[in-house]
A protein has these predicted regions:
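Cross-family detector of peptidyl-prolyl cis-trans isomerase
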Residues: 2-296
Length: 296
């Protein structure tokens, strides 16, 4: 070989430059004794309240999300532990006692949800007050979802199943907003309505229905296993709640999601499969014994 040159210099193989993937911190896992056995449960935040809903079918552990729905979580916890006054439906008197103890899951729909917290056990009744929703339409992306797709079909999130649904959920609120009150006034503005329908987003149509959003919050979609407030329309929360048995996209933006089941999922499944009558009421009562913070 020539002086000064190494014969057949072997270059090290080129090292590909790998950008390390961002490390997602592992979610905290805790050991909890539920239904007589130890369960390892993963939670979002070690500081979030954990509550046990103890029922005649067994116990469920829920993690609540105060950063996402502060007033809703506070209402639920204080009603549950008896530190919040409510109106007793039987006497009309203001009382303080653990609100949920002894109430039933009055509505169970297999593959959808279980609902409880009605003080009469009939699905009606409130704690004697109502409070506002805590939902961010922007964090849920409702302002980016159009009401109609390019084919003119309604967005599945609207839960429109018929022409009648479309009338009630989309057209009526839109006509009201535009001050269209007769067939004549509609005919005069049909092009305007058509144009609006093409650009209208889900947040806007829900606002026309009376929903009000707090876009400083960070909300979650109602996926399987969340606990959310039941209501009778915008800002009509009281004591009733439901726990989902499946993803329920069509409830997005209409119900405050304030927690998620973390343990005792088998108990939720058992309650969800309870035989019911035609009104979706369990044939045998599933009763809430207590709702209390997990001792840890």
């Amino acid at each position: 070989g020539l002086p000064g040159f190494a014969a057949e210099a072997v270059l090290p193989p080129a090292t590909p430059v790998v950008t390390p993937a961002p490390v997602t911190p592992a979610l905290p896992t805790i050991a909890v004794t539920l239904n007589g056995r130890i369960e390892q449960v993963t939670i979002d935040n070690i500081n979030n309240p954990l509550v046990v809903i103890s029922t005649t079918a067994g116990d469920m552990l829920l993690e609540l999300f105060p950063a996402e729905a502060p007033q809703t979580v506070a209402n639920f916890l204080t009603l549950a532990d008896g530190t919040k006054a409510f109106t007793d439906p039987a006497t009309g008197q203001q009382v303080m006692r653990p609100f949920y103890d002894g109430l039933i899951f009055h509505r169970v729909i297999a593959g959808f949800m279980i609902q409880g917290g009605s003080p009469t056990g009939l699905g009606d009744g409130t704690p004697g007050y109502e409070f506002a929703d805590e939902i961010s339409a922007v964090s849920l992306g409702l302002d980016k979802m159009l009401v109609l797709d390019e084919q003119g079909m309604p967005n599945p999130i609207l839960g429109v199943r018929s022409q009648q649904d479309f009338q009630v959920r989309v057209l009526q609120p839109l006509y009201q907003k535009l001050g269209i009150t007769s067939k004549e006034s509609l005919e005069a503005r049909v092009a305007e309505v058509d144009q609006l329908l093409r650009t209208l987003n889900v947040k806007e149509i829900y606002e026309m229905l009376g929903y009000r959003y707090l876009d400083t919050l960070n909300s979650r979609t109602p996926v399987q296993g969340v606990i959310a407030m039941a209501n009778s329309g915008p800002n009509s929360n009281g004591s009733q709640f439901f726990i989902t048995l499946a993803d329920t996209a069509w409830l997005t933006g209409k119900h405050t999601v304030f927690g998620k089941i973390r343990g005792g999922v088998a108990v939720l499944d058992i309650i969800g499969k309870t035989p019911v009558n035609t009104e979706s009421r369990p044939l045998q009562d599933v009763t809430i014994k207590t709702i209390r913070p997990l001792l840890r």
